[in-house]
Amino acid sequence: XXKEIXHIFHDN
């Protein structure tokens, strides 16, 4: 989880 990179890896 992380939104550090916009929402490319939308692994909330």
UniProtKB/Swiss-Prot annotation:
Major localisation: secreted
Signal peptide start-end: none
Annotated GO CC locations: extracellular region
Highest taxon in the source lineage: Bacteria
UniProtKB keywords: Antibiotic, Antimicrobial, Bacteriocin, Secreted
GO BP annotations listed: defense response to bacterium; killing of cells of another organism
Entry's localization field: Secreted
Function, in words: Has antibacterial activity against Gram-positive and Gram-negative bacteria including Salmonella, B.cereus, B.megaterium, L.casei, L.viridescens, M.flavus, C.glutamicum, C.crenatum, L.mesenteroides, E.faecalis, S.flexneri, S.aureus and B.thuringiensis.
Subunit structure comment from the entry: Monomer.
Name of the protein: Subpeptin JM4-B
Organism encoding this protein: Bacillus subtilis
